[in-house]
Amino acid sequence: MSQTFGNSSKYLFTSESVTEGHPDKICDQISDAVLDAIIAKDPNAHVACETAVTNGLVVVMGEITTSCYVEIPELVRGVIKDIGYTKPEYGFDDRTCGVLTSINRQSPDIALGVNKSQEAKSGQVDELDLTGAGDQGMMFGYACTETPEYMPLPISLAHRLSKRLSEVRKNGTLAYLRPDGKSQVTVEYHNGEAKRISSVVIGAQHDPDVTTEKIQADIIREVIKPIIPTNLLDENTEYYVNATGRFVVGGPVSDTGFTGRKILVDTYGGFARHGGGAFSGKDPTKVDRSACYMARYIAKNLVAAGLADRLEIQVAYVIGVAHPLSVSIETFNTARMSHEDILSIIQKHFDLRPEAIIRNLGLRRPIYRQTAAYGHLGRPELDLPWERLDKVDAIKATMESLSVSK
């Protein structure tokens, strides 16, 4: 029999996260800051904002159709300052970096399908049919019972480590740290249950006059130990802190960053499948973003209601059509009812048309920049609409009625 996550006596899984100062994450935050600024003034704007950052230069580009005006260079510098790139010795800072913009309007060919869906063109009058999907593609959502936030443990811990790394920099606990950084966690599973942490990896950018030994001791004490549960650590857990021995040059000085380069960091750390579309800089008519959020919302509520311990949902769309082409689920042999019944519950309680998703989750609001670092999903410290468990009671009631009818 093949060895799988659920039946293997020893199964290692690794996920990574990055800090807000990572070059790719700088770009995600800038793109979402532009989106938030526009959607706050014009909720129906169409935004596809991409950012590139390199040594001394930020380029913001994309397709934006809106009735409002925002000062993009000012937004860019504000994000860079908030992240912590404020010192010239970093080689990149908010005051001296160049900012270039190249913005066009959304293609009229795309607007034909988004502004008026195929269903609306055929004469149907349901207002939720009016908005077509902004592109073709497939989107995935996932939830599991490993953590209180229904996320896989490896990515949950990796995000918390990266966030802690930024916290100890900003609050002065480890004032020698610089904004760039990464984390990686390997969890050892036994028959589908997390048993121990096999290894923890931290990359922390730092000032040049700090010894490797001090950094390693400080990071283990101030970052790793406060985050990783002690019952998952043992004498064989391996710690790697700045494994090359030095991480002074970082951020856009050492690596060019782009929006959308950290799609697994943004989602489930590789634990679930991914359709390939990025989130940041996209308004909610782009199903790459809104349908992934909705799929997470569905999966989380279904798992919280007890339908399965692990559940992945796939939704697929075609550009200009409101209704999804397909909806499918995978429960990894943990379901407590048939897949047919689960799909009927999804159909009963969740409307997957883009306009319905936007309205039900309240997505035409400036809520996106806060998601652009440390994950779009899970995030118990944020009140994200796709993380709410407000469908659990209704799902349980339907489960009971289905059981009675059989």
Curated annotation (Swiss-Prot):
Binding site for Mg(2+): D24
Residues that hold K(+) according to the record: E50
CDD domains recorded: S-AdoMet_synt
SUPFAM superfamilies tied to this protein: S-adenosylmethionine synthetase
Pfam families listed in its UniProt record: S-AdoMet_synt_C (PF02773), S-AdoMet_synt_M (PF02772), S-AdoMet_synt_N (PF00438)
Keywords carried by this UniProt record: ATP-binding, Cytoplasm, Magnesium, Metal-binding, Nucleotide-binding, One-carbon metabolism, Potassium, Transferase
Chain positions covered by the region annotation Flexible loop: 106-116
GO terms assigned for molecular function: ATP binding; magnesium ion binding; methionine adenosyltransferase activity
Positions annotated to bind ATP: H22, D180, G181, K182, R246, F247, D255, R261, K262, A278, K282
Record: residues binding L-methionine: E63, Q106, D255, K286
GO annotations of cellular component type: cytoplasm
Pathway(s) the chain acts in: Amino-acid biosynthesis; S-adenosyl-L-methionine biosynthesis; S-adenosyl-L-methionine from L-methionine: step 1/1
Localisation: Cytoplasm
PROSITE patterns reported in the protein's UniProt record: ADOMET_SYNTHASE_1, ADOMET_SYNTHASE_2
Catalytic EC class: transferase
Cofactor binding notes: Binds 2 divalent ions per subunit. Binds 1 potassium ion per subunit.
An individual GO BP term: one-carbon metabolic process
Cofactor(s) it depends on: Mg(2+); K(+)
UniProt EC number: 2.5.1.6
Reaction(s) catalysed (UniProt annotation): L-methionine + ATP + H2O = S-adenosyl-L-methionine + phosphate + diphosphate
Free-text function comment from the UniProt entry: Catalyzes the formation of S-adenosylmethionine (AdoMet) from methionine and ATP. The overall synthetic reaction is composed of two sequential steps, AdoMet formation and the subsequent tripolyphosphate hydrolysis which occurs prior to release of AdoMet from the enzyme.
Similarity comment: Belongs to the AdoMet synthase family.
Assembly, per entry: Homotetramer; dimer of dimers.
Designated name of the protein: S-adenosylmethionine synthase
Species of provenance: Dehalococcoides mccartyi (strain ATCC BAA-2266 / KCTC 15142 / 195) (Dehalococcoides ethenogenes (strain 195))
Highest classification ranks of the organism: Bacteria, Bacillati, Chloroflexota, Dehalococcoidia, Dehalococcoidales
